[in-house]
Amino acid sequence: MKEKEAKWVVEGLVTEGHPSGMFRVQLDNGARVLGYISGKIRRKAIRIMQGDRVQIELSHYDLTKGRIIYRLPPPPIPKPKDSEDDSED
């Protein structure tokens, strides 16, 4: 059997949504690529929206297109500090 080729996995930010599950992704290195949703994400009905951080798999042959393989969880929202500690009685 033929060995599968290793692919690059990079992270980026979804900047635009296009029809048919295509997205414009701004990679962390500054490059912009066109990403499409992988089959597992499509089957599990995971929503990808503008502003989401994703992992995208790029081939060595075409660095302008890639497959979105994972949507990263959003960063935790910091809790506001309690005002009870600051009040003077």
Curated annotation (Swiss-Prot):
Oligomeric form and interacting partners: Component of the 30S ribosomal translation pre-initiation complex which assembles on the 30S ribosome in the order IF-2 and IF-3, IF-1 and N-formylmethionyl-tRNA(fMet); mRNA recruitment can occur at any time during PIC assembly.
Family according to the record: Belongs to the IF-1 family.
Name of the protein this chain belongs to: Translation initiation factor IF-1, chloroplastic
Organism whose genome encodes this protein: Jasminum nudiflorum (Winter jasmine)
Lineage, opening ranks: Eukaryota, Viridiplantae, Streptophyta, Embryophyta, Tracheophyta
InterPro entries hit by this protein: NA-bd_OB-fold, RNA-binding_domain_S1_IF1, TIF_IF1
GO molecular function: ribosome binding; rRNA binding; translation initiation factor activity
Protein's job: One of the essential components for the initiation of protein synthesis. Stabilizes the binding of IF-2 and IF-3 on the 30S subunit to which N-formylmethionyl-tRNA(fMet) subsequently binds. Helps modulate mRNA selection, yielding the 30S pre-initiation complex (PIC). Upon addition of the 50S ribosomal subunit IF-1, IF-2 and IF-3 are released leaving the mature 70S translation initiation complex.
Domain S1-like, chain residue ranges per copy: 1-73
An example Gene Ontology CC term for this record: cytosol
Subcellular localization, as worded in the UniProt entry: Plastid, Chloroplast
PANTHER family xrefs: TRANSLATION INITIATION FACTOR IF-1, CHLOROPLASTIC
Keywords annotated in UniProt: Chloroplast, Initiation factor, Plastid, Protein biosynthesis, RNA-binding, rRNA-binding
Xref: Gene3D superfamilies: Nucleic acid-binding proteins (2.40.50.140)
